[in-house]
């Protein structure tokens, strides 16, 4: 654990989900839920000091993109320094609810995956559901919303996703629920972008164009 992570946890314990970063085993398990065989657009909510971000960046292709949404200014600055030479990684110091706007601003139709470790259980119900809706809207048909949480209470709120798979992962302190919420292939449009083909699961970025 870095000194920065410990310091930020002490200053903002309710914003940072755990006193220690994710274990290597958890990071690898979460990354295994994604298919990196082709270019992807991936977003991460609350990357903190970037343990998951670094694993994703190592695995994704040269034509992929990773959007990191970090509210904490110190973490955001640290992430900018870490990925300063990686044009695929975009650090956004702001709320994850900005995902649809940030995608469109950068010319991306949607995400293949959204990863989140933010503690959803502490969010007010209206904010929780609003973020779930924006996440669902921003995902490509066939895409996945992947969360790792101490509790699995989000499943009862994420009813707009058609299917979910969960596992309880013990090789982390504390143990975590890893849940993948799936968006079906049947969705036809999102946020003004038109879906053109359905050849892959999840759909790669090349399958979309601006409407």
Per-range role (PLM):
Residues 3-37:
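Class I SAM-dependent methyltransferase Rossmann-like catalytic core
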Residues 76-105:
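S-adenosyl-L-methionine
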Residues 141-149:
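Conserved beta-strand signature within the Rossmann-like core of class I S-adenosyl-L-methionine
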Residues 72:
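Conserved SAM/SAH-binding beta-strand->alpha-helix loop
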Residues 39-48:
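Conserved class I S-adenosyl-L-methionine
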Residues 50-54:
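Glycine-rich SAM-binding Motif I of class I
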Residues 5-10, 105, 133, 158-165, ...:
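SAM/dcSAM-binding transferase cores
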Residues 129-141:
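A short glycine-rich, Lys/Arg-flanked "PGG" loop and its adjoining helix->strand segment in the class I
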